[in-house]
């Protein structure tokens, strides 16, 4: 499958507008730095797919035809947190570390973003052998795969984007782990309870998630909520408090915040 890659300049004040892409159901984008260190927005469209209306007023600075394979080649193996490596190239062969093999496809989440890194950090810190884990908004499946390789007994990964589900399923097969990947609009198709719920999505979506998360957790469960812009942190905390959750630990990189929560 071939894609058209469109590159747009991105000012700091425009980054919050990118959050609206999720609300429009558009997931095939990434925020990166160009060779001059300037932030740019990369959009990926299937050949023949029209530019979404909400992007028609944005200035395009570059355009090319590409494939998912091209993006994988650009990524080199890296250590996302101590002892856990992301390997898009299958170059790493180590027995003294956790290695996550990755075929990014076009779903968000290669492990380069601070929100993914902080989520993996807290999974490594808090996940106990035999825990059950639910990954809501799984994207490429990095967090679900990490959870299984860290010792979780059962891992379920869900996403509302069908393409993300396909990419996550491919990555699960590539890593030869037992993870159930399925479509679900947040928790709509999720059954059972879990020791840890991890979710790397937008603050507004966390607010919706918190309205139903008690159904899939128990008194000793833990939430790891990432993808929160710092100025929206209080909004998430207020909603969490309404449903009986308090912040156990907080981590921030740049403007991005990750919260670990326990029942009060």
Swiss-Prot record:
Catalysed conversion reaction: L-lysyl-[protein] + 3 S-adenosyl-L-methionine = N(6),N(6),N(6)-trimethyl-L-lysyl-[protein] + 3 S-adenosyl-L-homocysteine + 3 H(+)
Any single biological process term in GO: methylation
One annotated Gene Ontology cellular component of this protein: cytoplasm
GO MF annotation, one: protein-lysine N-methyltransferase activity
Major location category of this protein: cytoplasm
Subcellular location: Cytoplasm
Function, as annotated: Methylates ribosomal protein L11.
HAMAP family, A to Z: Methyltr_PrmA
Protein name, as recorded: Ribosomal protein L11 methyltransferase
The species this protein was found in: Thermotoga sp. (strain RQ2)
Gene assigned in the entry: prmA
């Amino acid at each position: 499958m071939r894609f058209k890659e469109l590159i747009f300049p991105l000012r700091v004040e425009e980054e919050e507008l990118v959050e609206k892409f999720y609300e429009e159901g558009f997931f095939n984008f990434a925020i990166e730095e160009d060779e001059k260190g300037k932030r740019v927005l990369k959009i990926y469209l299937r050949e023949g797919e029209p530019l979404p209306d909400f992007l028609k007023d944005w200035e395009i600075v570059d355009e090319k035809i590409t494939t998912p394979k091209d993006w994988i080649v650009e990524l080199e193996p890296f250590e996302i947190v101590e002892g856990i490596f992301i390997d898009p190239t299958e170059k790493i062969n180590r027995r003294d570390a956790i290695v996550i093999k990755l075929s990014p496809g076009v779903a968000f989440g290669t492990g380069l973003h601070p929100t993914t890194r902080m989520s993996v950090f807290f999974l490594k810190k808090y996940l106990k052998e035999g825990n059950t884990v639910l990954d809501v908004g799984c994207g490429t499946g990095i967090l679900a795969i990490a959870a299984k390789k860290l010792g979780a007994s059962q891992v379920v990964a869900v996403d509302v984007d069908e393409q993300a589900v396909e990419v996550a399923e491919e990555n699960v097969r590539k890593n030869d782990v037992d993870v159930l990947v399925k479509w679900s609009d947040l928790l709509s198709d999720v059954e059972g309870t879990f020791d840890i719920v991890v979710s790397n999505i937008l603050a507004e979506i966390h607010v919706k998630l918190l309205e139903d998360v008690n159904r899939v957790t128990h008194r000793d469960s833990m939430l790891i909520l990432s993808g929160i812009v710092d100025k929206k942190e209080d909004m998430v905390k207020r909603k969490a408090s309404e449903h009986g959750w308090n912040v156990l630990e907080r981590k921030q990189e740049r403007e991005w915040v990750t919260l670990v929560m326990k029942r009060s």
